[in-house]
Amino acid sequence: MKVIALVDGEHYPEVTRWGLSSAAASGYDVLAALAVGGAEKLDRERALDLGRVPVLRGEVDPMGALAAAIDELRADAVLDLSDEPVLSYERRMELAAVALARGCAYVGPGFRFDPPVRDAPLRVPTAAVIGTGKRVAKTS
């Protein structure tokens, strides 16, 4: 699966490189890394050296930069390796919405959002269970 990784400067570049190589070992083809902010662990020049993975700058406009990267690189998914405080949950969901609107999955540690299915509806009845609470399938 071809992915664009979201990274930040709040992690040491060595750790980010390890995360990218682990992603590659898990079957992801990392096309590029999009830097979404943070510079705590970067050098004076704020350079983010991720080896063979090209780094795209998205600190000023992460949503626009992600949209452009998805369109240009034709990624299948966005792999979120960033963390707070660089990306708040609100900002993370905005980036997920950008990816999903362009037909890309949004993947992170312990979660995956897939874009809506745009195929024609099935010709047979279907059922869905949503909004279940803690008392589902229990007797009271």
What kind of region is each of these model predictions?
Residues 1-107:
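Long, basic/Gly/Ser/Thr-rich N-terminal segments
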Residues 40-43, 114-120:
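Low-complexity, flexible helical/coil segments
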Residues 61, 108-112, 138:
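Short amphipathic alpha-helical surface micro-motifs
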Residues 96-117, 130-132:
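Short, acidic/small-residue loops that bind anionic groups at enzyme active sites
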Residues 116-140:
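Walker A (P-loop) phosphate-binding motif
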